[in-house]
């Protein structure tokens, strides 16, 4: 049986271009410290949230207004036994027009129920996409999800 990668979907009234541009500014919706760039193919950036999470992403696929894929090239999840369990996974954003709205399908390929951080990581992604990124797309201002 195929393992189910984590996925969540939002639908907004903004254009695919607006959704695409918001995705490519993770510092405005992914709560934590971000260094580097996510503007174009092969860009790299690091993400850190306190002492819990550090990861490095490289943009490996970018189709304007349609799709963005990040490859996690390094990761340290401090509360997991396998601290590198995100390394080699891919984070995909698929954009599609649907009934005069824009659908964004988020998939973390490799984040499945067998991964130790699945529950906490999938909960965090749900909040980040459904609240943080959604707010950035719909209001122009991202929302900090993890406070304190």
Where are these regions (language model features)?
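Generic structural detector for well-ordered beta-strands
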Residues: 9-11, 46-48, 58, 94
């Amino acid at each position: 049986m195929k393992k189910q990668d984590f996925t969540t979907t939002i639908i907004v009234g903004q254009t695919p271009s607006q959704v695409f541009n918001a995705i490519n500014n993770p510092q405005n919706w992914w709560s934590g410290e971000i260094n580097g760039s996510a503007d174009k193919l092969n860009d790299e950036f690091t993400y850190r949230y306190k002492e819990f999470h550090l990861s490095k992403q490289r943009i490996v696929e970018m189709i304007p207004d349609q799709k963005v894929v990040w490859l996690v090239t390094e990761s340290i999840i401090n509360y997991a036994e396998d601290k590198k369990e995100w390394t080699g996974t891919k984070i995909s954003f698929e954009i599609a027009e649907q009934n005069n709205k824009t659908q964004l399908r988020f998939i973390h390929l490799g984040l499945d129920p067998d991964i130790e951080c699945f529950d906490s990581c999938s909960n965090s992604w749900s909040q980040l996409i459904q609240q943080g990124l959604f707010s950035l797309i719909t209001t122009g201002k991202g929302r900090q999800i993890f406070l304190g």
